[in-house]
Amino acid sequence: FAAKPHVFLQKDHPLASKKVVSVHDLAPYPRLNFVQGEYESVYFSEELFSSIPVDKEIRVNDRGAIVNFMLGLNAYTISSGIFPKYLNGENIISVPLAENETMHIGYVLNENQELNELGKSYLEELRKYAPANP
């Protein structure tokens, strides 16, 4: 499905009350990038705009660390806007990003393979967030 990018911030962040945030608004704050490994290619980055230079960047490979940095450093990350509340209650919010980009969220499956139960469960959960965008 397609999703507009959002900025994840802690609820008391100076930008949290804005209806829309621009990349320019984010410049004074540390950007958090999630990396899968030391040699990850920019082509497989999980965050939009990760190739845009910033003054402060923290690269993490632990999703819990992302939350802790958001809470402790007024840091941010850019993603789909989907953030399960069970990960940190009401402390993390998402604000739409004022950029003309679209994220495409889905999965890749070998043509000779069927989804297992975990994969089917994943798709069911995704569809709850985007029922109009199959």
Predicted regions mapped to residue ranges:
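Structural motif corresponding to alpha-helix initiation and N-cap regions
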Residues: 20, 60-63
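Beta-alpha-beta core module
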Residues: 3-4, 64-114
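Extended ligand-binding regions for polar small-molecule ligands
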Residues: 24, 104, 108-134
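Short helix-loop capping/hinge motifs at secondary-structure junctions, enriched
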Residues: 12-21, 99-101, 112-118
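Secondary-structure junction motif
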Residues: 23, 29-52, 115-119, 133
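A local structural motif
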Residues: 48-57, 91-92
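Flexible hinge/capping segments at coil-to-helix
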Residues: 1-31, 35
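Short secondary-structure boundary segments
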Residues: 11, 38, 80-83
